[in-house]
Amino acid sequence: MTRGTPAFGKRHQKTHTLCRRCGKATYHKQKLRCAACGYPDAKMRRYDGWGQKVRDRKGQGTGRMRYMKTIARRAKNGFRSGTQAAPKVKAATN
């Protein structure tokens, strides 16, 4: 039985296929689990305890941030809602 470098040439089967949640080719066909996002787990797989690089790739601020990008502006104004802007008064000309 050969071990090591020659044995690696015999590997030609695909262990991973496309994941239906994250779209990466990281869904393990035998384990039935995605290595990237953790599908079919209910919660997305996190990369918290790893290095800075992987957190920058997958963490908050790398996507659309549809909700988070408005937070700074709303916080500056005190999270007010349902109010009307005061009408602008034209400057008096002489």
Swiss-Prot record:
Where on this chain are zinc fingers (C4-type) annotated?
19-37
UniProt KW RNA-binding keyword: yes
Q: Describe cofactor binding as the record notes it.
A: Binds 1 zinc ion per subunit.
The listed locations are: Cytoplasm
Plastid as a keyword?
Answer: no
Q: Which GO terms describe its cellular component?
A: cytosolic large ribosomal subunit
Name the domain of life. Eukaryota
What is the protein's species of origin?
Tetrahymena thermophila (strain SB210)
Q: Which UniProt keywords apply?
A: Cytoplasm, Metal-binding, Ribonucleoprotein, Ribosomal protein, RNA-binding, rRNA-binding, Zinc, Zinc-finger
Which Pfam family, any one of them, does this sequence belong to? Ribosomal_L37e
Q: Could you say which cofactors this protein requires?
A: Zn(2+)
Molecular functions (GO terms): rRNA binding; structural constituent of ribosome; zinc ion binding
**Which Gene3D superfamilies does the entry link to?**
2.20.25.30
Q: According to its UniProt record, which protein family does this protein belong to?
A: Belongs to the eukaryotic ribosomal protein eL37 family.
Residues binding Zn(2+), per UniProt? 19, 22, 34, 37
The role this protein plays is: Binds to the 23S rRNA.
Q: Which PANTHER family match?
A: 60S RIBOSOMAL PROTEIN L37, RIBOSOMAL PROTEIN L37
Task: Enumerate the Gene Ontology biological process terms.
Answer: translation
Task: Spell out the PROSITE patterns in the cross-references.
Answer: RIBOSOMAL_L37E (PS01077)
Span-the-membrane segments of this chain are none
The name on file for this protein is Large ribosomal subunit protein eL37
